[in-house]
């Protein structure tokens, strides 16, 4: 029994030796065994990946001519005549920008037309006379703004319904002439109203609400230049004042037909019963997408509650109890509009006017995106500003706007530019009112060619002399990018504009990829489209 185990093992070994060998290749003495340097499984995966990549790539016919997108790597260029299909894969130049090795990469969305979309086909839109404006209003327009000869597309769509007394929402690209589109018809309505001698600063007949004191100064200047020829008085009420100074300012101002105010200053005046809105003929919310932000929403809500807004156009002509016409103007569709309208009027009474290029990238402005390390942004900025200054000495050039995301960055960057002997102005919301007063007007008049600012200068401010916008900090949202880029390429701009954006963080790259994809597909920017519909249910 003890020998049974070893005998079995010996029998098994003999049987294995005597069986024929299978799958064995007899090699000669001169043949060597293959050396496996890459595991077969990994090698098969690489072969499958390469074969799959080759099957997805299709030859693209590159046509001669201008480019829509020009990248550092020529294979990622896209001709202006090429349009990608809806389901066709877009070769993004910014696809790998979240990796740190992508630094120093760049691409540009090129200028594909020379004029602003609002100025195209002006001859086919008729004249201001055809829109229903009276001769005295046309004469005031000719004297105040002689360079405006024909209406833009936005003005052609906006003026007739305003003259008919309709509540209006106008959403159009920046720099398309929206200010004149509401001032002209509303001034004409004021002239048809009560006697001008009954004006009172404490009870204006028109109100224009804007988000910043700089925009209030600008709108007041444009409105007063028109109103001066019509016998109308326009007064501006800016923020940043204490109650005592606000009262003093109100008492010193002459009687007014139209008040241009910021939400904070008007809220203080209404709370103190220094101003009444019961005699309003119209109320305009300019840059309404900004006014409906959380920082302004409560103030704007209170102001609208104090305003007698009409339910229908018939109430505007009531001689005993006239109501106000509501006008909303902005460069993007505002969020939260349904909730706001449900408190003051029905959304069905609102006529919506939108432009064909709403939420689209401007086709007449070159936009460059540079992937940079955070520490390299200052060096790149100084180099661009010095090149711009050198070019301005040899040929006519415009001014430069440098946008930052915070007031502290504006101050810090200002000190850096001072060290490099680069003259500039600074504008940010934390400045005292006395320091902020007149800074943007000085920049518009050309006292300095460079303005370092926050988004306070990106909403509505007219900047026809600006040639370059530099996003030192990439804007946090696509709405902010639209507003910043809209400081160039405006109606009446004297120089072709360009935008340069520094891209640093991964969340910046995500927005850049959305912008590039929209440009390559020739579509509007995602996430901005909206509409005005039924009001949302109010909370009990």
Swiss-Prot record:
Give the protein's biological function: Plays an essential role in facilitating the proper assembly of the mitochondrial large ribosomal subunit and its helicase activity is essential for this function. May be involved in RNA processing or transport. Has RNA and Mg(2+)-dependent ATPase activity.
Cite the PANTHER family for this sequence.
DEAD-BOX ATP-DEPENDENT RNA HELICASE 50 (PTHR47960)
Residue ranges annotated as motif Nuclear export signal? 180-191
Record has rRNA-binding as a keyword? yes
Name the CDD domains for this protein.
Answer: SF2_C_DEAD
> Entry's InterPro entries?
DEAD/DEAH_box_helicase_dom, Helicase_ATP-bd, Helicase_C-like, P-loop_NTPase, RNA_helicase_DEAD_Q_motif
Gene Ontology process terms (BP): mitochondrial large ribosomal subunit assembly
Which GO molecular function entries does the Swiss-Prot or TrEMBL record give? Answer: ATP binding; ATP hydrolysis activity; RNA helicase activity; rRNA binding
Q: Spell out the PROSITE patterns in the cross-references.
A: HELICASE_ATP_BIND_1 (PS51192), HELICASE_CTER (PS51194), Q_MOTIF (PS51195)
- Give the quaternary structure: Monomer. Found in a complex with GRSF1, DHX30, FASTKD2 and FASTKD5. Associates with the 16S mitochondrial rRNA (16S mt-rRNA) and with the mitochondrial ribosome large subunit (39S).
The entry's protein name is Probable ATP-dependent RNA helicase DDX28
The EC number(s) given in the record are: 3.6.4.13
Query: Where mainly found?
Result: nucleus
